[in-house]
Every structure is written in structure tokens, then in C-alpha cells.
Amino acid sequence: MENLQKMISEKSVVIFSKNSCCMSHTIKTLFLDLGVNPTIYELDEISRGKEIEHALAQLGCSPTVPVVFIGGQLVGGANQVMSLHLNRSLVPMLKRAGALWL
């Protein structure tokens, strides 16, 4: 989906989320606490949310929310992001993508 690729590549950190998902809330809070200002797309609030969710599933994202892209690259869902954070790889990745300066 061309629109999805554009959404992913426009910002250094992009999160696809749903307001009703507790793991989405956890991931958004983590990035905000780290000082990152991610672009967040709430799939249950935007008109093409189901279409975007289907496109994420075709990329192999399961579950389809939350899904995080850093520097235009798929990082994955909550498990992958938390693993990167716990092994101290997330912050360097964010710095390389220009999402963090400190």
C-alpha cells in the first residue's frame, strides 16, 4: 500500500495504535517517557484504519497493533520494542533515526 509507505517514511518514529489497546498505550508511554515525539496513527479513529491494519498484517505484523517503525524500518510490536528497550538497544536506534539527540 503506497499510502502506508508514505506514512512510515515521513517521520522518524511512527506508531500504529488503537485507543482500546492497553499494549498500544504502554508503547506510546514508553516513547514519550524517553523524550521521543512519535507520529501516532490511531487505527480505530481514522477513516482508512481497517485498510491500514490489513496492510500491516500483509507486512507480517501480528498482532497488528501496536506496530512501531523507526527510521522507516519495521521494528515490530510491543514484545520487540520492549526487548530492545530492556537490552539497551532502543535508545541508540532512536538516536540513529534522529528521534533523540541526547
Swiss-Prot record:
Keyword Ribonucleoprotein in record: no
Pfam families found in the cross-reference section: Glutaredoxin
Top-level taxon in the UniProt lineage: Eukaryota
GO CC entries: cytoplasm; nucleus
Gene3D superfamilies, alphabetized: Glutaredoxin
Motif (Responsive for interaction with TGA factors): 99-102
Subcellular location: Cytoplasm; Nucleus
GO molecular function terms attached to this record: 2 iron, 2 sulfur cluster binding; metal ion binding
Record: residues binding [2Fe-2S] cluster: 21
Annotated keywords: 2Fe-2S, Cytoplasm, Iron, Iron-sulfur, Metal-binding, Nucleus, Redox-active center
Keyword Iron attached: yes
PROSITE patterns, A to Z: GLUTAREDOXIN_2
Chief place where the protein resides: cytoplasm
GO term, biological process aspect, one: response to nitrate
Residue ranges of every copy of the Glutaredoxin domain listed in the record: 1-101
PANTHER family listed in its UniProt record: GLUTAREDOXIN (PTHR10168)
NCBIfam families found in the cross-reference section: GlrX-like_plant
Job description of the protein: May only reduce GSH-thiol disulfides, but not protein disulfides.
Family indicated by similarity: Belongs to the glutaredoxin family. CC-type subfamily.
Protein name: Monothiol glutaredoxin-S3
Organism, as annotated: Arabidopsis thaliana (Mouse-ear cress)
